[in-house]
């Protein structure tokens, strides 16, 4: 699985969107939407929801779900989205360590690049809900370094650790 495309389990997707307390008027972006597991909850609230997915098969599924996805590499989402898309909330479950096949190496830095680009697009004062592997947590050196780097742009208010077994039935474990 070159791009590390593992769908977010529905219960985890629901929890993330619930905790963000989405409101009428919010503009939502899911920059690496995959099967739309996160975006469907925002869309169910009738919020303006934008999806992006690089994989053509998953984009087709997003279209079936009623989205009009763009097809950019989420690592560069801020560079390519039209200026009118200025989300008040970003929901994401980026690849934890995959480069999308561009290099032979995997590193959590690739997933962090997705996060940085989405953060750059987030409206000032907006909300950001993200699912990361353990390497993205504050208690890992890599994660701590990353969050310190972006701390001027975002305030971490809550971290929930989820047992990797929640992902087994979706084809992966963290």
Predicted segments with their positions:
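Class I S-adenosyl-L-methionine
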Residues: 1-65
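S-adenosyl-L-methionine
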Residues: 60-82
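Glycine/threonine-rich flexible loop motifs
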Residues: 100-106
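Catalytic phosphate/metal-binding cores of nucleic-acid and nucleotide-processing enzymes, i.e., regions
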Residues: 13, 89-92
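Conserved Class I SAM-dependent methyltransferase catalytic core
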Residues: 16, 107-168, 173
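A short acidic, Gly/Pro-enriched loop at the edge of an enzyme's catalytic core
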Residues: 80-90
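Conserved acidic residues
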Residues: 26, 88, 157
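A short SAM/SAH-binding and catalytic strip from SAM-dependent methyltransferases
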Residues: 91-100
């Amino acid at each position: 699985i070159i791009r590390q495309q593992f769908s977010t389990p529905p219960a985890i997707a629901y929890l993330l969107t619930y905790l963000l307390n989405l409101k009428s008027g919010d503009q939502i972006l899911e920059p690496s939407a995959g099967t739309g597991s996160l975006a469907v909850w925002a869309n169910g609230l009738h919020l303006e929801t934008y999806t992006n997915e690089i994989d053509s098969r998953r984009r087709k599924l997003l279209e079936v779900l009623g989205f009009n996805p763009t097809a950019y590499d989420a690592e560069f989402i801020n560079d390519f989205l039209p200026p009118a898309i200025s989300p008040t909330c970003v929901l994401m479950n980026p690849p934890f360590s995959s480069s999308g096949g561009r290099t032979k190496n995997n590193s959590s830095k690739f997933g962090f690049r997705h996060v940085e680009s989405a953060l750059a697009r987030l409206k000032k004062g907006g909300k950001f809900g993200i699912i990361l592997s353990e390497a993205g947590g504050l208690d890992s050196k890599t994660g701590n370094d990353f969050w310190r780097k972006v701390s001027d742009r975002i305030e971490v208010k809550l971290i929930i650790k989820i047992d990797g077994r929640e992902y087994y039935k979706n084809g992966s474990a963290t």
